[in-house]
């Protein structure tokens, strides 16, 4: 199979689903249906077949790459006459709102933990590095939430640099999708994992395309392997609207929810509001900031209907 996109054709090896699935080799399935149920996101229908066909081959590839990096590190440590370093392998997962980045990240974390070479796999989302809600309001960025300028990039880069340098304990802020804000006084501690998975909208950006301060390093400078989860925009908008309706029945019904005022909407009213949010915020962010970084990824997972992967593109 070859990509229709000439840039992708030049940069990537392209696999149809069936071609990719055979690359699983003999990797055993380590997740049960209950495990998968716990990993699924809102409005996603990931099956064990999807894990077998797409994620097991990917976990095998990543295991081989991480092992090679570890072996190279041992050689370098021996050459330099130093103790083995504790620098983790960093995998980033990028893509649009509603594409399923979080589910992809959780499944990969669960699978990679079962390889004996790297049992400690941590997952951090960049949501926690969004400026606090009060700061976004003060800066006039509330309608730009998710855009690069809405993140505390200095804090994010300092976090990832500390993890990469092998610092014993590094704290990351935690985000609540209920309050639409950082959780004050709470944090996630990352303690020298073998692998760190970093999931977020803008983790593939560089100084070439970001409106924030370009004089300091970007997250992408610290990443060893990057994944972009891709889908056509009409599907992304559809999934966002479906997810919005699910949230209206679930998280929005919580009186503490920032979006509690949406809980009483009819389906038609909710669809109109979700479409407007997509057209004014998520869609423009995808077109301006997220999709242009796609071809920087080492691997692209292309989704079709029902969140099913249709193609995999692997950097040559």
Curated annotation (Swiss-Prot):
* Recorded metabolic or biological pathway in which this protein acts: Cofactor biosynthesis; coenzyme A biosynthesis; CoA from (R)-pantothenate: step 1/5
Where does this protein reside within or beyond the cell? Cytoplasm
Can you name one GO molecular function term for this protein? ATP binding
Q: Which residues bind ATP?
A: 95-102
Which top-rank group of organisms is this from? Bacteria
A GO cellular-component term linked to this record: cytoplasm
Q: Which reaction does it catalyse?
A: (R)-pantothenate + ATP = (R)-4'-phosphopantothenate + ADP + H(+)
- Report the EC number(s), separated by commas if there are several: 2.7.1.33
Q: Chief localization class?
A: cytoplasm
InterPro entries for this protein? P-loop_NTPase, PanK, PRK/URK
- Name the UniProt key words of this record, in alphabetical order: ATP-binding, Coenzyme A biosynthesis, Cytoplasm, Kinase, Nucleotide-binding, Transferase
Give any single GO term for biological process.
coenzyme A biosynthetic process
Q: Which HAMAP family does the protein's record reference?
A: Pantothen_kinase_1
Q: Which family does it belong to?
A: Belongs to the prokaryotic pantothenate kinase family.
Q: What is this protein called?
A: Pantothenate kinase
- Gene, per the UniProt record: coaA
């Amino acid at each position: 199979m070859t990509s229709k996109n000439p840039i992708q054709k030049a940069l990537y090896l392209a696999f149809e689903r069936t071609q990719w699935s055979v690359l699983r080799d003999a990797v055993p399935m380590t997740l049960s249906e209950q495990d998968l149920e716990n990993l699924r996101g809102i409005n996603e229908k990931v099956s064990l077949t999807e894990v077998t066909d797409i994620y097991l081959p990917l976990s095998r590839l990543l295991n081989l790459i991480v092992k090679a990096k570890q072996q190279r590190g041992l050689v370098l440590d021996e050459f330099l006459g130093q103790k083995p370093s504790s620098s983790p392998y960093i995998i980033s997962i990028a893509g649009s709102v509603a594409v399923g980045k979080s589910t992809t990240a959780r499944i990969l974390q669960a699978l990679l933990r079962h390889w004996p070479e790297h049992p400690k796999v941590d997952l951090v989302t960049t949501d926690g590095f969004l400026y606090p809600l009060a700061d976004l309001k003060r800066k006039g960025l509330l309608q730009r939430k998710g855009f690069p300028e809405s993140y505390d990039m200095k804090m994010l880069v300092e976090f990832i640099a500390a993890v990469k340098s092998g610092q014993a304990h590094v704290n990351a802020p935690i985000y609540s999708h209920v309050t639409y804000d950082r959780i004050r006084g709470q944090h996630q501690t990352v303690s020298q994992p073998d692998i760190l998975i970093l999931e977020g909208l803008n983790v593939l950006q560089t100084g070439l395309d970001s409106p924030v301060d370009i004089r300091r390093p970007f997250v992408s400078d610290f990443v060893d392997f990057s994944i972009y989860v891709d889908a056509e925009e009409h599907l992304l908008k559809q999934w966002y609207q479906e997810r919005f309706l699910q949230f209206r029945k679930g998280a929005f019904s919580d009186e503490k929810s920032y979006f509690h005022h949406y809980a009483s909407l009819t389906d038609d009213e909710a669809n109109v509001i979700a479409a407007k949010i997509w057209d004014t915020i998520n869609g423009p962010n995808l077109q301006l900031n997220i999709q242009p970084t796609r071809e920087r990824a080492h691997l692209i997972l292309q989704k079709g209907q029902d969140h099913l992967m249709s193609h995999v593109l692997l950097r040559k």
